[in-house]
Amino acid sequence: MSLKRSDDYQDLEEGIAMEDGGNIKDEEEKPLDPIEEQNKKRWVLIRAVLGELLCTFLFVYVLCATSANFIRLGSPPNPVVGGLSTGFAAVALIYSFADVSGAHFNPAVTFATCVTRKTSITKGLMYVGAQLVGSVLASLILLATFPGNFPGDKNAASAVAIAPSTDANIGNAFLTELVLTFILVYVIFAVAFDTVDNSVKTKVVGKSSSNNLTIYTTSGQTKAGFAPIAIGFTLGFLCFLGGSVSGGAFNPARVFGTALVGNNWTRHWMYWIADFLGAGLAGFAQKFFSSTHK
């Protein structure tokens, strides 16, 4: 969920902007030798992958712990509390990790960035691997922080595992996951990536004389600044939708760790295929509507 264009590596800074008497000037840095430059790029990638692992761990743990706490208290699931905790956690984590890894914490989001060529396949595979490790670690920590048996003689991980409703067929659940993931990824691509000219710092108003249609748009920088809030709100309201049908995952990392640790693989494949399909369609759809699309 990057707040900037998701290139394979950050470009190295070529100069340092320094203020001298109110004027800004560039001071050239000594070029790095090829080995040093390669090492720096490698470290940036390693840091990004580790950041994605930690970000996913925190996100999945918050969601699972919220559900586990309700179950231990004997309270029925509360979609409002679940939506708020999901949204707030997403906002905090995106602000915290956006400049480290891009804060995807969702294999479907990473897949969409790969198929739209915002992320390389190699980096995407490393991200997905890190996300799955983070998901498993979150489920293991959940067992340590919520001990004892849950209803149905389940452990904490299996108790909060997401699965389709028993009264919904596979088509209902598949389509629900696809649509919810499409909404999420479309919003992420629309607000988190540079879709307009960043050199435009102010709002642009265009008016068509033929039909009196006024179009308002904002700069990429303005949109990116509010991206964590927009994404958090989207995750929050999506929690109110589809939970009674598919379980409302729209994130394969949310279901993988609990499925592995809790040994609950009910229709697990659906959350990968439906979510990846919805994410890919959303990425291409947003690219089509983007102002930079040629």
Curated annotation (Swiss-Prot):
Gene Ontology CC entries for this record: cytoplasmic vesicle; membrane; plasma membrane
Membrane-spanning residues: 43-63, 80-100, 124-144, 173-193, 225-245, 269-289
Membrane topology listed for this record: Multi-pass membrane protein
GO MF annotation: an example: water channel activity
One BP term from GO: water transport
Region (Required for water permeability): 208-219
Consequence of substituting D275A: Impermeable to water in Xenopus oocytes
Site (Selectivity filter): C239
Induction: Inhibited by mercuric chloride.
Domain remark text: Aquaporins contain two tandem repeats each containing three membrane-spanning domains and a pore-forming loop with the signature motif Asn-Pro-Ala (NPA).
Protein task: Putatively gated water-specific channel, requiring a cysteine residue within the channel. Impermeable to water, glycerol and urea when expressed in Xenopus oocytes. Not regulated by pH; channels remain impermeable to water at pH 7.4 and 5.2.
Listed name of the protein: Aquaporin-B
Organism ancestry: Eukaryota, Amoebozoa, Evosea, Eumycetozoa, Dictyostelia
Name of the gene this protein is made from: aqpB
